[in-house]
Structures are given as structure tokens and as C-alpha cells.
Amino acid sequence: MPEKHLSSQFDSDLNNISSHVMALGGLVESQIRQAIFALSQFSPEAAEDVIVTEHKVNSSEVEIDREIASVIGRRQPTARDLRLLMAMSKTTANLERVGDEAAKIARMVKSILEGSAPRSLPSSDLRVSADLASGLLRKALDAFARLDVPMAVSILREDNEIDKEFDGFVRKLITYMMEDPRTISASLDLLFIAKAIERIGDHSKNIAEFIIYIVKGEDVRHTPLADVESSMS
């Protein structure tokens, strides 16, 4: 992934960290898939599987940051390499937060199951946004592995679709609660799930912004999408 250096050991260090970040991404992806399954099937077992995996994600984040700190201390990286290491650290933090959101979805599923709300809840409506968010994370990890700026820019664009799905679901959920007040508690759990899904999209967007920072040296956070597209073309 990174460009070659005079020190083969430095290249090895960078490649090891990159591999560990990608492995963490794979673990978090599996958490999301299991959380979506728990929601679609109202499966307490699947929800519990997501929750017990959370500590693996947390320990992976700590270990990657330890590796990054060690490389910075031993190698005295150049400005570009330091950008890469910083972006790896921030990407790791965002992946850990995606894991947190997956665990939050699982906990809300368990809360719904422990309540008395009817199974006619509009949970299936979340599948579209959940699939979009899961696909966006996969794309962000692919872009990270390749340092693919055009793909990163497309992720910024696609995150808007998840935001639109979230807004539409909230409107539908409000109507649902008004029609049947018995579902208010479970509907609020669904609202938290919808927000968690939306946040997964946001974290994927953050990773895309870090990719642009690594390759171009430009911090595009808080920059309008049209301006980013123009500067990257």
C-alpha cells in the first residue's frame, strides 16, 4: 500500500500496520453483518454474538495505535509518512466506532425483544440503509487498501444517500408511533438503530477523507462536496 522506502524494515512496519487495519476492518464488517441479521430476524443469539465481539475490536484498536506510536518513535518518519500514520490511526479509531455502532444495534434489538411491542414494527425498512452503510464501509476499506482517491470521493457522495434514507425512516417512524402509541418504546429503539446505521455511513465518509489527506495532503473535512470534487478532478 505505501510507497517503497530506502529502509525495507520501515516498509515492513508500514505494511504490517496496514494489514492490521484491514483485519480490523474485516472484523467490524462481520459485526455489522451479524447486527443486520439480528435485526432482520429478531435473533437474540446473533445480537449477543455482536456484543461479545466488541472487546476484540477495542483491543485491536489499542494494539494498532501502539504499533503506530512505536514506528513514529523509532523511524522519525517524513511529513508524508507521518500523514499516512496519522490517517491510519484515525481510520482505526473510526473502525472502532463502527464496531460500537454495531454493538449498539445489537443492544437495541435485545431491548425490543425484551419488550412487548408487536412484531409488525417497520424494522425491515431499515434494511436498505443498513445495506447501503455496510457496502459503503466495504468500499472505504477497498479505497484505503488502494489509496484510491476517486473512489474516496465517490464515498463522500454516496453517504448523502444514507442520510436521506435516515430522514425518510424517521418521518415514517413518527407516523407509526402516532398511529399506535403502544409501540413508542420499541420505536425509539428502532430510531437509535437507524441513527447507528447513519453513523456507520459517517465513519466511512471520515475514512474516505483520510485517504484524500494521505494522497493529496489536503484536509477536506467540512469542505462542501462540490468543492472536493472540483479540487480532485
Predicted feature residues:
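Cytosolic, long alpha-helical scaffolding segments
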Residues: 1-233
